[in-house]
Structures are given as C-alpha cells and as structure tokens.
From Swiss-Prot:
InterPro entries in UniProt: Aminotrans_V_dom, Cys_dSase_SufS, Cysteine_dSase, PyrdxlP-dep_Trfase, PyrdxlP-dep_Trfase_major, PyrdxlP-dep_Trfase_small
One of the GO biological process terms: cysteine metabolic process
Record's function text: Catalyzes the removal of elemental sulfur and selenium atoms from L-cysteine, L-cystine, L-selenocysteine, and L-selenocystine to produce L-alanine.
Lineage: Bacteria, Bacillati, Bacillota, Bacilli, Bacillales
Source organism of the structure: Staphylococcus aureus (strain COL)
Descriptive protein name: Probable cysteine desulfurase
C-alpha cells in the first residue's frame, strides 16, 4: 500500500485538546464518527471573528457588517468549491445534517410525494435519515421501503434495482454508514433512481470529513453534511440541492432575512439561498467550517483516505486477534474508518467505561441506528472510529484496554 503523505505528529500538534491525560493516561480519542476535534486554525478564525468583526450580515452598510457578510458568503463559496456544486445558490447553511434532511423531507417531500408513492431507504441509516421519511410517509400515506443488505452489511446492485421502481419518488441513503463503515455507491444508486424519475437525497455526514466530494460526478439531487464531524464547529451543517429543485421548493422556516417583501397579510420570499436561511444565520460557524475545509484540503483527501485505510486495517487485524470479539460490517479493506464491535459477555457500555479508565474514548449504544441493531440481532455495540490525528499508538492503547477489560470480566470472584 502506498504511504500517506502527511506527518501525523505535526497534525496532532494542531489539536490542543489531545494534549491531555484522561484518568492519568494519554488521551486516545477514537470517537470522531460522533464528533471530531477542532484544530487551532479553526479556533483562531472563530476567535478572530468575535474579536474583530462580529456583526450581522447582508443588510448592514457599516464596516463590521460588510466584513461579516464577506466572511459568511466566502464560506459559502468555499463549500461550493469543496463539493463541486455549479452554483452558490445550491449551498444552504443549516444547523446540521439532521436539519438539512428534515428540510428536504418537509419542503420537497410534502410537495412531491402523494398517496401510494414509495420512499426507499436502507436499514443501515442513522435515525436522522429514517424518521423524517417515516413521518413523510405517514403524512402522505406513502410506503416506506428498505433495500435489503448483504450479510456483510453492504448493498447488492440487483437488490437496489428490484427495490427502486416507477412508484419511487425519493431514495434516501447514507454515503457511509456511521455504524458499519459501509461505503455506498451513490453514483450508481443515483443513476437507478433517476431512471425511474425519482430523486436521491444523500446523508453525507460520514463521507464529507474523509473523501473528496463531487456533486457533478455523483449527480445527487440533495446532499447533507455537518461541520462538527469534519474539524469544524458544532451547530453548522450544509444542504446541497440542485438549483432547479430548490427554486421550486417552499421554505419551512419564516422570519428575518428570508423575505423579499412583507405586508400585513402576505409575504414573498428572497432568492436562493437566502429563502432557506431564516433569522440570523450561523455566521461564525460557517466561517469556521470553511477554515476546516481548507485545513483538510491542505492535507489532501487522497492522503487522508490512504492513512485512515492503513489505520483501520491495522486496528481491524489487531482487534480480530482478541478472542471473543465480534466485528460487524464489511471486510477490512472495504470499509471506512469505523469499527463497530462487541466483546463476548461484556455489555458495550461496560466496555466503553472500562477502556475510558485507560484513556481511550469510544462510543457505546445503538448509535442512533436501532433498526440496524435489530438487523444485527444486538441491542447495542461499541464503536471505535479513526481520523487524521489518530495513530497506531492509539490503536495499541485500545487493544491493551480491551484485553484488560476481557480479563477483568472473565475473572471469577
């Protein structure tokens, strides 16, 4: 395998939160799938905004207002370029992936789904990409259908073709599973959806932090992701939507900035993208997200992918060697940097608590994916996930902690 081309030790220096001990041990943060850490470069632009040009945007003619507007709209352009969208109007800033998906479900879904229509999802989805479509189906008396998964938690092209048909109006799918690490072929699924006149809405929360995105090549109709999973601030997300679709959609939130004209009994809406950004927007957060994107681009997504793949394969092999561990999802060379597992006869929450005493942060629970837990025939799992600031030393620390946990819970008192 080709060597990655960045110095992880130099990267780690950019993350002050990692320079600490937890329970007397060096911190090994293996929970970036839930929330990533934030480099000083992003912290600095946030501080600079609040220190130098904190102001509201768009209508202010004073200097601070102009600087804030420039920062906010330049952030939009950074996102547009990052995902290779055609038009700046196609970039809507939201509170996060969940808000983005709900916007599509309510605005596009309510206007285009009718009784008897079908909405297609998978059992690997995060609740944020199941519940909005459940509720839409209930409101419209439509049918929610699930693409079957293979034994490894992947999608088979023939199953996709059999599930999507001329009744399908919306296909909603995760680009990468937050539990299994499955990487779905969004481009192919989009082609199949479009052949039947359906649109595709992609949950990209786990993909945007780790891979280069190209909306032209992928041909997704909607694509959603969050800043806090890709080194950015919390509270900021992005909805990409094709301009011709967004132009026909009605806003679902109303108030300041999103209006064109308001009379006593009626109102008209601003042009894209403003009509979907009611109220004071997420100014500092958008500026921080743009800096996070620039940080990742300086490292390079090819290098990021290679490094994460090396680390994931190493962790997978080391974990597989521990007797009593069950790992869920695709093989080690066909998954993103996520390993979800259970340790025999030890509850996942006990696993997470035990390894935390050794300074290792992993996630435990159903990971907002209860239908997937039912499919796996478990109530919950533990999950380790990897990012650009993780090392083999972090993995070794996890492995040692898991071995100690196994030994402790095997001890007969």
């Amino acid at each position: 395998m080709a060597e990655h081309s960045f110095d992880v030790n130099e990267v780690i220096k950019d993350f002050p939160i990692l320079d600490q001990k937890v329970n007397g041990k060096r911190l090994a943060y293996l929970d970036s799938t839930a929330t990533s850490q934030t480099p000083v470069q992003v912290l600095n632009v946030l501080e600079d905004y609040y220190k130098r040009y904190n102001s509201n945007v768009h209508r202010g003619v004073h200097t601070l207002g102009s600087l804030a507007t420039d920062g906010y709209e330049n952030a939009r352009e950074t996102v547009r370029r990052f995902i290779n969208a055609k038009y700046f109007e196609e970039i809507i800033f939201t509170r996060g992936t969940t808000a983005s998906i709900n916007l599509v479900a309510h605005s596009y879904g309510d206007a285009n789904v009718e009784e008897g229509d079908e909405i297609v999802v998978t059992e690997m989805e995060h609740h944020a990409n199941i519940v909005p479509w459940q509720q839409l189906a209930k409101r419209k008396n439509a049918t929610l259908k699930f693409i079957p998964m293979t034994a490894d938690g992947e999608l088979n092209i023939e199953d996709i073709k059999q599930t999507i048909n001329d009744k399908t109006k919306i296909v909603a799918i995760a680009h990468i599973s937050n539990v299994l690490g499955t990487i779905n072929d969004v481009k192919t699924i989009a082609e199949i959806a479009h052949q039947h006149g359906a649109i595709i809405s992609v949950d990209g929360a786990q993909a945007a932090p780790h891979m280069k995105l190209d909306m032209q090549e992928m041909n997704a109709d909607f694509y959603s992701f969050s800043g806090h999973k890709m080194l950015g601030p919390t509270g900021i997300g992005v909805l990409f939507g094709k301009r011709e679709l967004l132009q026909k959609m009605e806003p679902i939130e109303f108030g300041g900035d999103m209006i064109d004209f308001v009379s006593k009994y009626d109102a008209t809406w601003a042009d894209l993208p403003t009509k979907f950004e009611a109220g004071t927007p997420l100014i500092a957060q958008a500026i921080g997200l743009a800096e996070a994107i620039r940080y990742l681009e300086r490292i390079g997504f090819d290098a990021i992918h290679k490094y994460e793949q090396e680390l994931t394969i190493y962790a997978y092999e080391q974990m597989s060697a521990i007797e009593g561990i069950e790992i869920y999802g695709p093989p080690k060379d066909r998954r993103a940097g996520v390993i979800t597992f259970n340790l025999q006869d030890v509850h996942p929450h006990d696993v997470a608590t035990a390894v935390d005493t050794e300074g290792v942060a992993v996630r435990a629970g159903h990971h907002c994916a209860q239908p997937l837990m039912k499919w796996l025939n478990v109530s919950s799992t533990a999950r380790a996930s990897f990012y650009i600031y993780n090392t083999k030393e972090d993995v070794d620390q996890l492995i040692n902690a898991l071995k100690q946990t196994k030994e402790f819970f095997s001890y007969e008192f």
